[in-house]
Amino acid sequence: MKYSVFILFFVLFGCKSVQQINQQKVENAITKNALQLLEDKRFHSVSIAVLKDGKSTIKHFGELTIGKGNKPNDSTLYELASVTKTFTGYVAAKAVLDKKINLDDDIRIYLDESYPNLEFKGEPITIKHLITHTSGFPNMPLKSENKEAFFEGLKLIKIETKPGEVYSYSNTAPELTAYILERVYQKSFEELVSEFVLKPNKMSQTKFTLNENDRRRLVKGYNDKNELMPNFTRTLWGGISGLHSTTTDLVKYMRLQLDQSNLIVNESHKKLYKEGTDFWEGYHWYIIENDNQLIYRHHGGIYGMQNWFVIYPKQNIGISILTNTSFDETGKILEKVVDSLYDDIIK
């Protein structure tokens, strides 16, 4: 009996030790890569969240305000910028499963006017084309001061390639997707994101609309000349950008995206358009798959901050990195940090 108790104690203690070692390994990897990033003096702070095998690790470095030493923390609110599109993709995937929309629907069936210009030689633009950046829409909306102007801008678009054939990143298309989702559910896009994503996953710190307390926690970012940049002002639906979140909430979002029993997640991760040898577009996810790896990821960049959100389902890992700096090379630099961090974690 004593021998059995000893064995049980040894097993439990051994398991705990392994968990502690793995946790320390993740913490060390985060610290190493964060400090290396901050050696580039264009960066002032960085927050990194990692979820591995259900265990989260969050660390913050640097200062939010130059010269103040005010390190970010778990309550710091970041602008997610284009990572918001993955929420748009999730709601769109739910709409497909709910049979509210069909990927092959001509988008004009959801519009109040005819828009004869939104086709190419008789080939219509579909929901799938909007979601995969293959619609032929311009990058930025031609008019975006308000929703009414947005639809006037749609009339000015000239489609010059067959929809579904050429990838061209568009911030116009996801806004139209958000409008269509509003129309089929008869709820605002903000309500849909809250009802389908935020509330079920207890992401109470992720939101489009901020109150006074939220605004005090919102990051103010810089460009590479250390000039303070404005926060994004949403004038349309929020299909392309507009969500704010914390590292703790982003860990909850990782848990959602790693839940392979979730039918909406599985739908949103489907490969809808093949862009390269091992590169696909999903429901606003960039998907990389080859013999060695499967990755779902998205980058977000706005005037004064940038971030990457990356999921590795085979390894049960999620990584989010956020910084209060934005310039042309920021995305590529952060991408390399994520790659290095991932390599250090799985060594």
Task: Locate the predicted segments by residue.
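Catalytic loop of the DD-peptidase/beta-lactamase superfamily, centered on the K-T-G motif
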Residues: 15-62, 182-185, 191-195, 199, ...
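Short, solvent-exposed loop/turn elements at domain surfaces
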Residues: 57, 70, 138-141
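Catalytic-site signature segments of enzymes, centered on catalytic residues
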Residues: 77, 139-217, 235-251
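Sec-dependent N-terminal signal peptides
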Residues: 4-12
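Short active-site loop at a secondary-structure junction
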Residues: 39-47, 67-129, 161-172, 238-241, ...
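Extracytoplasmic/secreted proteins, especially bacterial periplasmic and envelope-associated proteins
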Residues: 25, 29-36, 82, 87, ...
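Active-site helix/loop module of the DD-peptidase/beta-lactamase fold
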Residues: 79-82, 95-137, 156, 183-225
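Acidic-glycine-rich active-site phosphate/pyrophosphate-binding loop
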Residues: 60-68, 148-152, 221-226
